[in-house]
A protein has these predicted regions:
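N-terminal helix-turn-helix DNA-binding core of bacterial DNA-binding proteins
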Residues: 11-54, 75, 81
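A short, conserved structural fragment
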Residues: 63-71
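Recognition helices and adjacent regulatory flanks at domain boundaries
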Residues: 1-9, 46
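N-terminal amphipathic/basic helix or basic patch
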Residues: 8-11, 93
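Basic amphipathic alpha-helical segments that dock to polyanions
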Residues: 55, 59-62
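Alpha-helical linker/hinge and terminal dimerization helices associated
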Residues: 65, 94-106
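Short loop/turn motifs at secondary-structure junctions and domain boundaries
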Residues: 7, 73-74
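Basic, amphipathic "hinge/linker" alpha-helix immediately C-terminal to the N-terminal HTH DNA-binding motif
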Residues: 74-97
Length: 109
């Protein structure tokens, strides 16, 4: 897990956005929250426009921050599954509110 001791945050929102900010992290977390365990390829198909490099980076960061769990199965072909950790599950109400806000305001675009 990343060490945030050296970094001082002005407020808790800044810390939260450090962990889940950006274009892809909230969407990855949303799909894992709604669909449960997903394999890498399944996540990639859900995120139209994301590159392999970006998805790999985002998954590694979410895992390092303790928000998702990566389960690797040593078999042929290799199998890796991603799921929310207990800490990651605490973000579900926030993601649900973001979804609700988006549904209410998307039609105005």
């Amino acid at each position: 897990m990343k060490s945030f001791i050296a970094k001082q945050y002005a407020c808790p929102v800044e810390y939260t956005l450090t962990l889940i900010g950006g274009k892809w992290k909230p969407v990855i977390l949303w799909h894992l929250a709604n669909d449960g365990i997903k394999r890498y390829g399944e996540i990639k198909k859900l995120l139209i426009g994301i590159t392999h490099k970006m998805l790999s980076q985002q998954l590694k960061e979410l895992e390092a921050d303790g928000l998702i769990h990566r389960e690797e199965y040593h078999q042929i072909p290799p199998k890796v599954e991603y799921s929310l950790t207990d800490k990651g599950k605490t973000l579900i109400p926030i993601l649900q509110l973001m979804c609700q806000w988006g549904q209410e305001n998307m039609e105005h675009i």
